[in-house]
A protein has these predicted regions:
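Extended hydrophobic secondary-structure segments that form protein cores and membrane-embedded regions
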Residues: 9, 244-253, 324-331
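Sequence/structural signature of outer-membrane beta-barrel proteins
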Residues: 16, 106-108, 154-156, 254-256, ...
């Protein structure tokens, strides 16, 4: 028995850091080391000219002499998460209850770059909500009832590209081949002029701009799970001593809704420039692409119902003979939400008897 309810509230915050952060060299160091790596006796070919190295060191026009730390451009070295929990319990000899509500929010290590270029934020964002409600009632001296209602919600938003692939691209792109983007005034088009370069290791004829790949598009996923259970325990001593009936009914419904919004992007390379006037021209790689977001989505889920009844007789005669008889019946039904074929629309059913 509790004179008054017991209430608990807990709020936590956490900072996560990367276990190991790669140290990236700057552009001039990269070019010098690259020239040294490919040089050999009798060959004085240098992929990067001294003029480009000197211009990068001097910090001249960053579109002609880019010096991009792609990892630092995309990733934060730490991320913050928070969680909160509220619960209350109480009751008396006739009834007791427990209720709990939990909330959790976490972000990834990506920087929120997409909102600098578009109207959406595609950074990793996870929200989790959990609700638990349990109620136990002693209706009579021989009758006990239990009811449980639970709800779990997971709401996730993330870039269209997997974070591992984004990390790999940031490791592949070198700091001096192209800038993140070119100035908007170099074209009369209203889309972002992403930097790029002809060639590449992906077999497409060009390199892949890590920032452009990251910020273009996003996906969302909402998952909900609802469970409910009802239990009845009835002693049947009025019929015969030691006889007891227990009934259980449970229900679970799971649903998932996913949406993907994707778009192409237009990328350019510096086709020519004049070192004396610092004027340059850019050329689009491939055909012009539509930057309008396209939408694709899917829904799925399932539900399950379960019923169980137990009739149990347990009695000791004259403190010597122990008699125990049990009869059990159960049945289960499983359905798919939104079936797409005749076969998948048919419920799966099971029945069982034991004694």
């Amino acid at each position: 028995n509790l004179d008054k309810p017991i209430i608990n509230f807990r709020l936590e915050g956490a900072i996560s850091t990367m276990t190991r952060v790669p140290n990236m060299v700057d552009g001039p160091t990269y070019m010098k080391m690259f020239n040294e790596a490919v040089s050999r006796p009798g060959c004085d070919v240098s992929p990067y000219s001294q003029e480009k190295i000197d211009g990068t060191i001097a910090g001249l026009n960053p579109y002609i002499y880019p010096n991009v730390d792609w990892f630092d451009e995309i990733f934060n070295k730490s991320a913050f998460s928070e969680r909160a929990n509220f619960n209350i319990r109480g009751g008396s000899s006739k009834m007791d209850y427990f209720m709990s509500a939990s909330f959790k929010h976490s972000n990834g290590h990506l920087k929120s770059l997409s909102k600098d270029y578009f109207s959406y934020n595609n950074n990793v964002r996870n929200y989790n909500y959990d609700f638990i409600n349990n109620l136990n009632i002693s209706a009579t001296r021989t009758t006990k009832i239990s009811l449980g209602l639970n709800l779990s919600v997971a709401d996730k938003k993330s870039p269209l590209m997997d974070v591992n692939d984004i990390f790999q691209l940031s490791m592949e792109a070198n700091p001096v081949d192209f800038p993140v983007r070119f100035p908007a005034n170099m074209s009369d088009r209203d889309f972002v002029l992403w930097g790029d370069k002809l060639g590449g290791i992906h077999g497409q004829g060009w390199y892949r701009n890590p920032v452009a790949e990251y910020v273009t598009g996003y996906k969302t996923n909402l998952r909900t799970t609802i469970t409910a259970n009802f239990k009845l325990a009835q002693e049947l001593d009025m019929i015969t001593k030691g006889l007891k009936f227990t009934g259980l009914f449970s229900f679970k419904n799971y649903s998932s809704s996913s949406t993907e919004r994707s778009a192409s992007y237009n990328h350019y390379y510096m086709s020519s420039y004049d070192p004396s006037s610092m004027e340059y021209k850019i050329t689009r790689i491939g055909d012009e692409q539509s930057t309008a977001l396209t939408n694709d989505g899917s829904r799925n889920g399932d539900r399950k119902m379960y019923f169980q009844a137990i009739l149990d007789y347990n009695r000791i005669f004259k403190e010597v003979h122990d008699l125990n008889i049990m009869f059990l019946y159960n049945q289960e039904q499983y359905d798919i939400n939104g079936p797409t074929t005749l076969f998948s629309s048919l419920p799966q059913r099971k029945q069982g008897v034991a004694g």
